[in-house]
């Protein structure tokens, strides 16, 4: 008697339109095997989901919808709990899997998962519920180049087969999940660009996006909401973006604020624009009918310059669209990020190391002509990321110590010091912990004798 092979259902977990576009590109590129059914599991991770549009309600989503057989809301599934704050109790995991198989019509299908940010909920919760399912992790931003932010349960980490990521920094391999031997796989850039083109051309995707000829596009991130800087400092950061763009000769400015940013920032920028003699358009809720991806603006407006702090969109502008880019404020963030293992550290480091400051006219002009970031030796960049990654998560990546020591011994200078903290280097006994002028002390016989004497007296007491 012949037994039919088991059905396979692939569940794709997404919380952003950009992430869904990454998944769509991976599907179009053949990165996933055929399956009997594909479900897009949508999560709205906003602080107050009820007041924010879910990604499946955003303009342009319909262009991506056809890749999936069904769309399911994770928020509805676990209501009234918030996706970022809920996970199943260990004893309840079998009950939850049984419930979801019934609710989603999965039956006895073999399950395969594709999730983002597996180290935290809600993606971690989904991976925990489907205990035996193999997992593919996809990363759509710069954080993929950094270390895993938390130690992942081996019962989850060892199930991860690969890391799908965009080639935002050519030649640099992601650190994420390498502690489990997970191999990275690039989602082809040309396929991703094609998907973004579909988003830009979709009905309603450009509603309210004004046709401004070759403006300087300023990207807001609402960093104060993350506790990285104060609201006043972030407002000043936006004004610095404006002044820098105008100093480079741009008088038509378009500001894309974070969807939840305070309206008073836009007013302050309007006043500054008048002083600078510039024309400012703010793409807020008074202009747009819904949030729009920066990449849609790149195709619609073809900006002459893109300015931001450490947004991934700076790299997509430079690497994928060949647009001139400039950074503002990374030096402040490198100093302020706390604790040192803050997961934003690698994105800020990459932007600071590879993209030009808005005050550097020549470098900004080169950034567009070169179609990519400022050239940095691959070994130097890999060494920098390895050193910062080890300093961030030494317990997760102990194998990176030799690479970190080599980099610090050879490259620690006035330029690279901003990526490290002396206290951190000291706690890890890394090069640079002791100032160069005092480096002779550990090798001095007299100093060693005094230290031993003091140590003995302390022990006796």
Tell what function each PLM region has:
Residues 248-289:
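Catalytic donor nucleotide-activated moiety binding site of glycosyltransferases and closely related
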Residues 138-230:
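A nucleotide-sugar donor-handling region in carbohydrate enzymes
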Residues 203-264:
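Conserved catalytic-core segment of nucleotide-activated headgroup transferases in glycan assembly
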Residues 11-159:
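Active-site and donor-binding regions of nucleotide-sugar-utilizing enzymes
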Residues 21-24, 54-55, 93-97, 231-245, ...:
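Well-ordered, non-membrane alpha-helical segments in soluble/globular domains
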């Amino acid at each position: 008697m012949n037994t039919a092979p088991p059905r396979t259902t692939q569940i794709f977990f997404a919380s952003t339109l950009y992430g869904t576009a990454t998944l769509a590109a991976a599907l179009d590129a053949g990165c996933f095997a055929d399956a009997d059914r594909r479900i897009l599991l949508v999560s709205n991770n906003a602080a107050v989901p009820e007041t924010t549009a879910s990604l499946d309600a955003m303009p342009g989503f319909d262009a991506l919808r056809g890749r999936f057989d069904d769309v399911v809301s994770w928020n509805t599934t676990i209501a009234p709990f918030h996706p970022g704050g809920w996970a199943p109790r260990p004893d309840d995991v079998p009950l939850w899997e049984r419930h979801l198989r019934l609710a989603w019509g999965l039956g006895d299908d073999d399950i395969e998962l594709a999730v983002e940010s597996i180290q935290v909920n809600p993606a971690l919760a989904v991976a925990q519920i489907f205990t035996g399912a193999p997992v593919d992790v996809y990363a759509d931003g710069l954080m993929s180049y950094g270390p895993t932010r938390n130690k992942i349960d081996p019962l989850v980490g060892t199930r991860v087969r690969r890391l799908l990521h965009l080639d935002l920094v050519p030649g640099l391999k992601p650190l994420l999940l390498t502690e489990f031997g997970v191999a990275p796989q690039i989602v082809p850039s040309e396929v991703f660009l094609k998907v973004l083109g579909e988003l830009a051309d979709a009905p309603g995707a450009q509603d309210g996006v004004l046709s401004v000829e070759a403006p300087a596009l300023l990207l807001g991130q609402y960093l104060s909401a993350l506790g990285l800087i104060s609201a006043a400092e972030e407002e000043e950061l936006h004004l610095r973006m404006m002044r820098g763009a105008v100093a480079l000769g741009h008088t038509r400015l378009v500001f894309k604020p974070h969807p939840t940013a305070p309206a008073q920032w836009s007013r302050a920028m309007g006043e500054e624009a008048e002083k600078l003699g510039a024309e400012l358009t703010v793409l807020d809720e008074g202009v747009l009918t819904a949030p729009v991806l920066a990449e849609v603006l790149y195709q619609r407006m073809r900006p002459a310059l893109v300015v931001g702090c450490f947004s991934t969109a700076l790299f997509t502008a430079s690497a994928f669209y060949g647009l001139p880019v400039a950074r503002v404020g990374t030096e402040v963030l490198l100093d302020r990020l706390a604790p040192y293992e803050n997961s934003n550290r690698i994105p800020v480091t990459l932007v600071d190391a590879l993209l030009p400051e808005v005050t550097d006219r020549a470098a900004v002009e080169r950034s567009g002509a070169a179609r990519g970031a400022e050239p940095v030796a691959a070994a130097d960049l890999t060494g920098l990321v390895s050193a910062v990654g080890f300093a961030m998560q030494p317990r997760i990546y102990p194998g990176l110590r030799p690479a970190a020591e080599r980099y610090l011994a050879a490259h620690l200078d006035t330029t690279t010091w901003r990526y490290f903290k002396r206290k951190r280097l000291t706690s890890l006994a890394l090069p640079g912990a002791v100032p160069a002028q005092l480096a002779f002390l550990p090798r001095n016989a007299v100093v060693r004798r005094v230290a031993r004497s003091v140590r003995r007296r302390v022990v006796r007491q």
